[in-house]
């Protein structure tokens, strides 16, 4: 059912394009700052294509905004300190230092990000407009790794791969969805600068730990 709904939502803008007079495409990219609860924030990026479909039949300035982007998310653990008194029989790995050490974990999943927003633009000058849009987004997990860095009290830090693919290895759910908004300015009808935020509504962690995507976004786009 989710796949059918997603397919219909993706097809809607393209079905409307055939009769639309106010349709534009462009390229977009920018910065992500992911900060799921309980973890340190991690920087990422997004890059891809976007489209805009004007809806003057409803009211002037109203439009649909949608995109197809590669987007990196993730998080870092706060850094847990161990005094070296681990117990191998309890499932702890014997390759850890016998002295005290700090364990830092980092997870970097990559998604196919599909936002579908409704927005409004209003001019504030001859070649400048302000805009705001909001709506759902859908994420489809593509690939990503989880790594652990061990920093002993004495010695050199080492990093090793814990999970080769966070989606295939049953660490994260492949499908995610949520709500987002963007606000920004458009210059000369071509250059768009915006900031926004995405609230994930689905728990992405398969272990049962409550872990939802929370992402600050800053973007730059060029519309043709």
List the predicted regions and their residue ranges.
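Outer-membrane beta-barrel strand-turn architecture
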Residues: 53-59, 122-126, 187-189, 224
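Outer-membrane beta-barrel "beta-signal"
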Residues: 185, 212-224
């Amino acid at each position: 059912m989710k796949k059918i709904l997603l397919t219909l939502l993706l097809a809607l803008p393209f079905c409307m394009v055939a009769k639309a007079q106010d349709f534009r495409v462009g390229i977009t990219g920018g910065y992500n700052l992911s900060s799921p609860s309980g973890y340190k924030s991690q920087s990422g990026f997004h890059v891809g294509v976007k489209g805009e479909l004007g809806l003057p039949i409803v009211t002037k300035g109203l439009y649909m905004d949608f995109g197809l982007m590669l987007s990196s998310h993730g998080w870092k653990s706060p850094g847990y300190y161990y005094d070296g008194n681990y117990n191998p029989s309890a499932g702890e790995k014997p390759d850890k230092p016998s002295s005290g050490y700090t364990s830092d974990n980092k997870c970097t999943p990559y998604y196919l990000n599909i936002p579908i927003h409704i927005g409004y633009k209003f001019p504030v000058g001859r070649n400048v407009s302000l805009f705001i849009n909001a709506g759902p987004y859908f994420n489809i997990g593509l690939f990503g790794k989880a790594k652990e860095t061990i920093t002993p009290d004495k010695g050199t830090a080492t990093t090793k791969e814990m999970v080769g693919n966070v989606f295939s290895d049953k660490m994260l759910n492949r499908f995610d969805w949520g709500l987002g908004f963007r606000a920004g300015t458009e210059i000369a009808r071509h250059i768009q600068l915006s900031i926004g935020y995405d609230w994930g509504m689905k728990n992405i962690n398969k272990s049962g730990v409550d872990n939802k995507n929370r992402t600050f976004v800053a973007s730059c786009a060029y519309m043709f």
